[in-house]
Amino acid sequence: MSHNTFGHLFRVTTFGESHGVALGCVVDGCPPGLALEAEEIQAELDRRKPGQSRFTTQRREPDQVKILSGVFGDDRTGGRQLTTGTPIALMIENTDQRSKDYSEIRDSYRPGHADYTYDAKYGFRDYRGGGRSSARETAARVAAGAIARKVIPGITIRAALVQMGPHAIDRANWDWAEVGNNPFFCPDAKAAALYESYLDGIRKDGSSVGAVIEVIAEGVPPGLGAPIYGKLDADLAAAMMSINAVKGVEIGDGFAAAALRGEDNADEMRAGNDGRPRFLGNHAGGILGGISSGEPIVVRFAVKPTSSILTPRQSVNRQGEEIDLVTKGRHDPCVGIRAVPVAEAMMACVLADHHLRHRGQVGDRV
């Protein structure tokens, strides 16, 4: 299986399966001399790890990260661990696999999952928990994202769940401080209360629901990205689409821009106090012509409902026989919840990569 590496200069390669011994990543291209401790990576992983509320999978994984290479410290660094510029290898052991839950479906194709397509491509697959196609793989991305943030210290990246099922937040109530106060990473306290009762009903039905996640990067300087095939927004779209269960991505106003007139969509400019243009709006989501404008970068993506549900579903098996299938195992009733820290990580990886590419092409000019 190829295509396990993301990025050009800041390169992230992930490895591992849902029920394997461990998963992890190798980060190549991280500059030397950056302070990096396992605790900083762990803090990000703790936001994503399962089993923290009744609204996520009850699989209990501590997701303890181990740094295997790429950092070093001694008396000259004051005991701090600094990146050496060599590949940084991270490992997260799996400790709570329950593979027996999947023995009955090893020859069956679960509707909505990648079982059939993996079989069609490779002729062989790890059916335990979805193997490589499981969202468990995203733990490695979150770990890599913690390193990426070190490369772009002046940029703030935050994400939130802004819609669950048909219920969108009231943007007038947006408060970033609320994101850490509820299990949904929701910036609207009233919406979070609604989501609690709504998702309880979904769980009791043995069903699932989708979500919309919004991720915003502030402090991005103008100039990141390149025309045509190196567009920043193209790489961001690819990064978000690579997250499990994501079915659509938009930047700025996205699809809503199709309903606007030209004078409503184009962000007007005036002279700023720093000599640069000051934008009067941000319909473009911080990117023009594939290059960052200096405005906040705004990306949203849609996450489909978790395909593993208790309702019997029609399917077929490897022998071509028609079957009715009930999926067992432990699953998220809304996989979009834990996609929030994953979205931040992918934004960080893309921006770190483009920061290094920009510096390599034009120096430190911003």
UniProtKB/Swiss-Prot annotation:
GO cellular component, one term: cytosol
Top EC class, one word: lyase
Entry cofactors: FMNH2
SUPFAM superfamilies on file: Chorismate synthase, AroC
GO biological process: amino acid biosynthetic process; aromatic amino acid family biosynthetic process; chorismate biosynthetic process
S-S pairs: none
Pathway: Metabolic intermediate biosynthesis; chorismate biosynthesis; chorismate from D-erythrose 4-phosphate and phosphoenolpyruvate: step 7/7
One protein family per Pfam: Chorismate_synt
Statement: the UniProt record of this protein carries the keyword Amino-acid biosynthesis: yes
Catalytic activity: 5-O-(1-carboxyvinyl)-3-phosphoshikimate = chorismate + phosphate
Co-factor binding comment: Reduced FMN (FMNH(2)).
Family to which this protein belongs: Belongs to the chorismate synthase family.
Protein name per UniProt: Chorismate synthase
Native source species: Methylorubrum populi (strain ATCC BAA-705 / NCIMB 13946 / BJ001) (Methylobacterium populi)
